[in-house]
Amino acid sequence: TATSTVTLTERYLTPKDFQVNLELCKADFEQDWLAIEQGFSSFDEVPKSFANYLIGHVASKVASKMEQTIWTGADGNAGEFDGLVVLALADADVIDVAGVSAGAGGIDASNIIAELGKVVDAIPATIYGNEGLSIYISQADARSYVRAQATLGYKDLYHVGQTEMDFEGIKLFVANGLVSGTIVAGEKDNLMFGTSLQSDMNEVRILDLANVDGSQNVRVIMRFSATVNYAIGAELVLYQLSA
């Protein structure tokens, strides 16, 4: 016989469909790419290495945008879904930390240590000390932290060498999708990225239109779906600048 109750809640991953459809002209690349691959020639077939280059180029652009969307995306914006920061702002369970005033200049090397201290103080006991716990910071705030460590004379190296991205035993993870003044702390297992199929994020097609319409164009097509969420809001800390 049960002597207590358990309340269950659910959070969903609902992937959003995206598509990339670019059309490029091979003539723009002939002098600096095709000439290297096949010598001076009037043949316009796309060499395999050029196709690989296009795939890598487009994939890197998509990855950069996806990184930003994962953290600060908004579903109302074209090509985005609600990112982790937007979801956390709407969740009363998430632990909010008011940071230094944006009007005072936000985070810099002079206050980054104190502001990270506020984040650590807010981390709940249920996850503090866990191996998967990380503090996610922007690239700009990471630079401020490195400079602050140098000023403090890290390992007597000062401005020489590389600073460990660690704060009071907690790993600092540089998330390029975050903006300066926004910091997230939580376990990596609490953060979820989902697609409709495991292979969705690496499907790219190259279509050479020379055999279709006789043009010198190449079409790069990518279709995928993605979204993010977290499991337990009460085990997530969100730091933002004060007004």
Predicted regions, residues:
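Internal mixed-charge
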Residues: A59, A63, E67, Q139, ...
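Sequence/fold signature of self-assembling virion shell proteins
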Residues: A88-S110, S144-A243
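Alpha-helical scaffold segments that mediate packing/assembly in large oligomeric complexes
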Residues: W33-D121, Q240-A243
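Extracellular structured ligand-interaction cores
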Residues: Q19, I55, N130-G132, N217
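Assembly/oligomerization interface modules of large self-assembling protein complexes
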Residues: T1-I36
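Helix N-cap / beta->alpha transition motif
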Residues: C25, F29-D32, I36, I137-D141, ...
